[in-house]
Swiss-Prot record:
Catalyzes the hydrolysis of S-adenosyl-L-homocysteine to form adenosine and homocysteine. Binds copper ions. It comes from Rattus norvegicus. Disulfide bonds: none annotated. The lineage of its organism: Eukaryota, Metazoa, Chordata, Craniata, Vertebrata. Substrate binds at residues 57, 131, 156, 186, 190. This is Adenosylhomocysteinase.
Length: 432
């Protein structure tokens, strides 16, 4: 049984360093600290056996310890082979929480790690906390006998949410799920402001390239693409956007970006960033037209946006510069610099999003787990959202850290607007 192996990490000796990093992160994660203050005594997650599959970072470690403080048992794996921060994993293992994650897993090891999270000493998992859908898919396809005992899934990211809706449409989804990604305090903060900071961190750590004056091509102009485009423009790049959606394309044009196709943009760019969550965004024909030493990276969840297989099969030479940085020599004499093997550049080459913005996302995760565990009758099989009032509560929990002072409605104003004096302040369809 899996419970015979308490953990598997790169180096348990990194635990002390990891604990120091967690202590600092906690001070930057007021939402999770609020959850501990509110619920540590009542332990609403008592009895929950949560299998988690989400990037094993310092911030995730704070989330894990929050879930445990609220009464849950937790077993954890990372949702990406390169995203684990080994000191964070070691700190969690040292705290006695089963974790199976290390930076640089093989694809086989990655699946093995997920498998280790399914069985607890008192029985199999009964809750899922997922990022990207790999854990959800594994249980539905390989372990369907466990589905009847699972109360719910909370899904972190755009790719995983697409997966849930696809499963629902095909009649495959068997467990209630909460779409955490589309909570306003997740998608409009983590996806936008998080990527705005962590993309540049990843590119700079990997290449130390001067961004000012370069042409940067951003594939996709959703919340992630918007954050990436803002960051690159802020550093002085001329940014080109590619898009399939006319609304997003118009938004990009109105912000002053050139919008064109990848077939055109590939000839101009010095830096390429894919943000789409789709397949086949940068292909062989694009590589062949790129400038010498074009930098290519991805910040979408999976490694399917960039055709890395084409590079490996068609390049004359591949030179590893350092971990997660490879330089390919093409037959035309031009070189392509690929970051993180086409996987998440901000986690493969840097530390991911800052703690503060992840506190937004992870507070939503905690609330979703509490909702699904304590109110199962409210959530039939399907894909659900957190109530607007909880979304606003997540935002409110982070205002004090930024010295924000909210204006309060008067009774007259509330009556005039036709809303409760303490919110919710916007209808569910409001887009922010």
């Amino acid at each position: 049984m899996a419970d015979k192996l308490p953990y598997k990490v790169a180096d348990i000796g990194l635990a002390a360093w990891g604990r120091k990093a967690l202590d600092i992160a906690e001070n930057e994660m007021p939402g999770l600290m609020r959850m501990r203050e509110m619920y540590s005594a009542s332990k609403p997650l008592k009895g929950a056996r949560i299998a988690g599959c989400l990037h094993m970072t310092v911030e995730t470690a704070v989330l894990i310890e929050t879930l445990v403080a609220l009464g849950a048992e937790v077993r954890w794996s990372s949702c990406n082979i390169f995203s684990t921060q080994d000191h964070a994993a070691a700190a969690i293992a040292k705290a006695g929480i089963p974790v199976f994650a290390w930076k640089g897993e093989t694809d086989e090891e990655y699946l093995w790690c997920i498998e280790q999270t399914l069985h607890f000493k008192d029985g199999p998992l009964n809750m899922i906390l997922d990022d990207g859908g790999d854990l959800t898919n594994l249980i539905h396809t390989k372990h369907p006998q466990l589905l009847s005992g699972i109360r719910g899934i909370s899904e972190e990211t755009t790719t995983g949410v697409h997966n849930l809706y696809k499963m629902m449409a095909n009649g495959i989804l068997k467990v209630p799920a909460i779409n955490v990604n589309d909570s306003v305090t997740k998608s409009k903060f983590d996806n936008l402001y998080g990527c705005r900071e962590s993309l540049i961190d990843g590119i700079k750590r990997a290449t130390d390239v001067m961004i000012a004056g370069k042409v940067a091509v951003v594939a996709g102009y959703g919340d992630v693409g918007k954050g990436c485009a803002q960051a690159l423009r802020g550093f002085g790049a001329r940014v080109i956007i590619t898009e399939i959606d006319p609304i997003n394309a118009l938004q990009a044009a109105m912000e002053g970006y050139e919008v064109t196709t990848m077939d055109e943009a590939c000839k101009e760019g010095n830096i390429f960033v894919t943000t789409t969550g789709c397949v086949d965004i940068i292909l062989g024909r694009h590589f062949e037209q790129m400038k010498d030493d074009a930098i290519v990276c991805n910040i979408g969840h999976f490694d399917v946006e960039i055709d890395v297989k084409w590079l490996n099969e068609n390049a004359v030479e591949k030179v590893n510069i350092k971990p997660q940085v490879d330089r390919y020599l093409l037959k035309n004499g031009h070189r392509i610099i690929l970051l993180a093997e086409g996987r998440l550049v901000n986690l493969g080459c840097a530390m991911g999003h800052p703690s503060f913005v992840m506190s937004n996302s992870f507070t939503n995760q905690v609330m979703a787990q509490i909702e699904l565990w304590t109110h199962p009758d409210k959530y039939p099989v399907g894909v659900h959202f957190l109530p607007k009032k909880l979304d606003e509560a997540v935002a409110e929990a982070h205002l004090g850290k930024l010295n924000v002072k909210l204006t309060k409605l008067t009774e007259k104003q509330a009556q005039y607007l036709g809303m409760p004096i303490n919110g919710p302040f916007k209808p569910d369809h409001y887009r922010y």
